[in-house]
Amino acid sequence: MAIKFLEVIKPFCVILPEIQKPERKIQFKEKVLWTAITLFIFLVCCQIPLFGIMSSDSADPFYWMRVILASNRGTLMELGISPIVTSGLIMQLLAGAKIIEVGDTPKDRALFNGAQKLFGMIITIGQSIVYVMTGMYGDPSEMGAGICLLITIQLFVAGLIVLLLDELLQKGYGLGSGISLFIATNICETIVWKAFSPTTVNTGRGMEFEGAIIALFHLLATRTDKVRALREAFYRQNLPNLMNLIATIFVFAVVIYFQGFRVDLPIKSARYRGQYNTYPIKLFYTSNIPIILQSALVSNLYVISQMLSARFSGNLLVSLLGTWSDTSSGGPARAYPVGGLCYYLSPPESFGSVLEDPVHAVVYIVFMLGSCAFFSKTWIEVSGSSAKDVAKQLKEQQMVMRGHRETSMVHELNRYIPTAAAFGGLCIGALSVLADFLGAIGSGTGILLAVTIIYQYFEIFVKEQSEVGSMGALLF
């Protein structure tokens, strides 16, 4: 079944656009340059509006997911990284359910990656059509078939650019991956904007600045009651406040602290006597992968629910999946789930919301913890990081675990790696829930992604620096 599936995909993989692997070792300075170019292209696409749209001022159905999916409404980056992570989610679920199996051979791995890219392109086309036909840019009947086709083509080409930019970095030309880079940039931009935004918003209390820090100084300067001004700056509703900012900094610190948790397994060289080392198994063994896949699952559920609600709003099954309400308090118009499954899988808006609807909070916590643990556990099987894969890597490096023979290494690693993957995913989910309940800026999922990605880039810099010798030699 598995080989047949991969062989069916093979003819399509040949015609897919592909970035060739570098024929030489790419220097660190070149990697930094290519990473900067990739980021520049992404940011430019985030600012180029789609040609032909009649309106994008209606309530945004994906407002709550845009920070995580690195998308920007009404621009070429409307879809963001959603097609990539959705295709990864589908392939992982198929592999995890043993519907397809990926062998250890480079050929099977390459075919698996090709299948993921193919699904990514198909999903890009599908999401583009859904976005246009559900009226996100105006009534399709008023725009006409030509304009609808033009918008769909723009979204597809932009999605293809994102796929290739991600592959460019993954193949070794840049640092990290395009997905991680785009997510971290989007989240950090959101946090800085919510802290220092000079945009004014007309509230029931008068004109206020959106940025939490700027609002603090503005309230202190304009209000005669300074104590009340401080209270508003720390606890104001529907706009970023200082407690949100403090919660964000706190979650950053907690995640960085947990990044250092690991178990070091002693290993030794099978060839050279007396050469010892350690193999680290981190608490966050699968890093941010569980939260990315969980976000992809929820975002696609939102897309389906929104699409069905727009067409069959009175249907009972559609209402059970999700009912939506438009709101514009404290920012742009956006749609938010107020009932059905989508409501219970979305984070509570604040700690007060937790007290008002504890069932919602409990269901959300169970879903986050369970899904993150599941995705983390299954990811190691398809990503080459399972106990069997690690034992094979150590064997190729002629390393063995101290006190164990080569044949027993897999059994010993199985005691640690699956547990670390599941428990690490559980911790990622718990930290995300904590950040949501504390009201951290950018959502709990967004903060988790930003911290883990920034920490990954920090580790890359440290590794490169140790190889070169100094930061100056590294960059100049």
UniProtKB/Swiss-Prot annotation:
Stored InterPro entries: SecY/SEC61-alpha (IPR002208), SecY_CS (IPR030659), SecY_dom_sf (IPR023201), Translocon_Sec61/SecY_plug_dom (IPR019561)
Pfam families, sorted: Plug_translocon, SecY
DNA-binding found in the keyword field: no
Lumenal side: 54-76, 139-144, 194-240, 310-354, 442-445
Known outcome of mutating V85D: In CVID15; likely pathogenic; decreased function in cotranslational protein targeting to endoplasmic reticulum
Alphabetized UniProt keyword annotations: Chaperone, Disease variant, Endoplasmic reticulum, Membrane, Protein transport, Translocation, Transmembrane, Transmembrane helix, Transport
Protein localization: Endoplasmic reticulum membrane
GO BP annotation list: cotranslational protein targeting to membrane; endoplasmic reticulum organization; post-translational protein targeting to endoplasmic reticulum membrane; post-translational protein targeting to membrane, translocation; pronephric nephron development; protein insertion into ER membrane; protein targeting to ER; response to type II interferon
Record-annotated membrane-spanning stretches: 34-53, 77-96, 118-138, 145-165, 173-193, 241-261, 289-309, 355-375, 421-441, 446-462
Effect of substituting Q92R: In SCN11; likely pathogenic; reduced protein abundance in patient cells; contrary to the wild type, it localizes to the Golgi apparatus; localizes to the endoplasmic reticulum
Xref: SUPFAM superfamilies: Preprotein translocase SecY subunit
Residue ranges annotated as Cytoplasmic topological domain: 1-33, 97-117, 166-172, 262-288, 376-420, 463-476
GO terms, molecular function: calcium channel activity; protein transmembrane transporter activity; ribosome binding; signal sequence binding
Disease with which this protein is associated in UniProt: Tubulointerstitial kidney disease, autosomal dominant 5: A form of autosomal dominant tubulointerstitial kidney disease, a genetically heterogeneous disorder characterized by slowly progressive loss of kidney function, bland urinary sediment, hyperuricemia, absent or mildly increased albuminuria, lack of severe hypertension during the early stages, and normal or small kidneys on ultrasound. Immunodeficiency, common variable, 15: An autosomal dominant immunologic disorder resulting in recurrent severe infections since early childhood or infancy, and characterized by hypogammaglobulinemia with antibody deficiencies of IgM, IgG, and IgA due to impaired plasma cell homeostasis, although other B cell subset numbers are normal. T and NK cells are also normal. CVID15 inheritance is autosomal dominant.
Name this protein carries in UniProt: Protein transport protein Sec61 subunit alpha isoform 1
Organism: Homo sapiens
